[in-house]
Amino acid sequence: MLEFAISAPLDTGAELLSDQVSANFPWLSLSILFPIVGAFLVPFIPDEGEGKQVRWFALGIALVTFLITVAAYLYGYDPSLSGLQLSERVSWLPDLGLTWAVGADGISMPLILLTSFITALAVLAAWPVTFKPKLFFFLILAMDGGQIAVFAVQDMLLFFLAWELELLPVYLLLAIWGGKKRQYAATKFIIYTAGSSLFILLVALAMGFFGGGTPNFEYTNLAQQSFGTGFQLLCYAGLLIAFGVKLPIVPLHTWLPDAHGEATAPVHMLLAGILLKMGGYALMRFNAQLLPEAHAQFAPLLIVLGVVNIIYAALTSFAQRNLKRKIAYSSISHMGFVLIGIGSFSALGTSGAMLQMISHGLIGASLFFLVGATYDRTHTLQLEEMGGVGQKMRIMFALWTVCALASLALPGMSGFVSELMVFVGFATDEAYTLTFRIVIAGLAAIGVILTPIYLLSMLREIFFGKENDQLVSHTNLVDAEPREVYIISCLLVPIIGIGLYPRLMTDSYTASIQELVKRDDLALQRIKKPSALMIRNTTMTPAVVSSPRLPITQTRSEQLTRK
């Protein structure tokens, strides 16, 4: 039973929050506003040739947005610094504590680049869309700006607004362009995500108004507040539910297979490549960074939930006969490594979680794009209705094989590096007992073993075996076209590049991750040596080494012994 007594504050904010580096040019504001403005210009583009002009316009906006984020990284971001960079701050509604505050550090900058990169490829993947193309590309571009804002804003109320901004485009993309059960999938998505978002708003208001006076919702201010341990635990629990839906964490995951089961290929890429990463990013930014004492006590729970994700989703994926749902559960399984990395008090493990988000964003987008391309040819998602198409689609088979090998963490691919970092980081983390580390690592290894089994068997059922006569006679099994090869090639370049030389990515966020882990480690040390005002009994952290409990009462025999 937890006693929510208020503890003395963890006064580390001033030491660990480095000075902000102001932007020499409003790169981040431009990267947020440019695609949104472009989205509102889409309705004015002449609609001729089944939306051809609209496609080129949307692709141009997405590419320019990507170039803006690249320029921000090259000309305004220093990977060696751990603090906030590219900082922009404009007072908006000072009486309400609302400020337009954006910036980037190692936790957010790689994800900003990933967002703009995946979105540009998703626009190219949407080239065959001819039904209401103006509305489709309007939603894609608006979603681009909203997702970049999620990673760039430095104000918790702005974060909530950006978090909500991307919900409506996803809902409409599912409800209008989805499959037969699109209304069900879209409604389930909006209920899960919008309902859980209420916790973000409540926590933002509670933290912003903490201590009275003029509210302030900026991250740098919140990180230096004297939040008591009980208050942190309540906020942490609420945020864990909200972000756990988006990650997703089992059992808050059921919206994802339904959404993926009905989405089109470009929407698949945005869901798997970006949307899930918002949950992992938010856990790092808010739960781990702003609520360090609560994170130190919830961390073992995150690790257990991560193992549940890995094993449960891998077993469920193995049993799926629908191709989209199989890959969807595979995504849930891989995101379990993110939870384990965030729950570790190791810089290596947390860095591995960050790399796993980036790696899965690339690999997940590639796999789901191939699912869409395969469906366009076979017009079925049931594995038992496929088979024997490898001879007719050799290039497609080669693309599938490489991407599947990347997903099962083949050495030389980014997934291998990220999962290895999480494993080694957690296994060498002395914050947990040796028994706990062995059990968790052993259970997680089961998921690693299951992954190649269900992925390779999936390839066998799609491309090998006897040809389905009905499938061959009623479909046009043409091989991959240049556009499809180009999209997969663009995704494979960073996947293989990071796998061969991980520092291409890890150097961009190592300094920020080290600062984050240092802050959480100080909170952990404080829990190990609690003061009289701290929580007396924390049942959530049985695995933490040397977490002494305060003596509450003494028996008569103990008192006589001491005398």
From Swiss-Prot:
Family: Belongs to the complex I subunit 4 family.
InterPro entries given in the database record: NADH_Q_OxRdtase_chain4, NADH_Q_OxRdtase_chainM/4, NADH_UbQ_OxRdtase, ND/Mrp_TM
PANTHER family recorded: NAD(P)H-QUINONE OXIDOREDUCTASE CHAIN 4, CHLOROPLASTIC, NADH-UBIQUINONE OXIDOREDUCTASE CHAIN 4
Annotated Pfam families: Proton_antipo_M
GO CC terms in record: plasma membrane-derived thylakoid membrane
Function: NDH-1 shuttles electrons from NAD(P)H, via FMN and iron-sulfur (Fe-S) centers, to quinones in the respiratory chain. The immediate electron acceptor for the enzyme in this species is believed to be plastoquinone. Couples the redox reaction to proton translocation (for every two electrons transferred, four hydrogen ions are translocated across the cytoplasmic membrane), and thus conserves the redox energy in a proton gradient.
Protein name: NAD(P)H-quinone oxidoreductase chain 4
GO biological process: ATP synthesis coupled electron transport; electron transport coupled proton transport
Enzymatic reactions: a plastoquinone + NADH + (n+1) H(+)(in) = a plastoquinol + NAD(+) + n H(+)(out); a plastoquinone + NADPH + (n+1) H(+)(in) = a plastoquinol + NADP(+) + n H(+)(out)
Organism: Prochlorococcus marinus (strain MIT 9313)
Molecular function as annotated in GO: NADH dehydrogenase (ubiquinone) activity; ubiquinone binding
Keywords: Membrane, NAD, NADP, Plastoquinone, Quinone, Thylakoid, Translocase, Transmembrane, Transmembrane helix
Membrane topology (UniProt): Multi-pass membrane protein
Main location: membrane
Transmembrane segments: 25-45, 56-76, 90-110, 111-131, 133-153, 157-177, 189-209, 230-250, 264-284, 298-318, 335-355, 356-376, 397-417, 438-458, 485-505
EC number(s) on file: 7.1.1.-
NCBIfam families xrefs: NDH_I_M, PRK02546.1, PRK12561.1
Compartments, as annotated in UniProt: Cellular thylakoid membrane
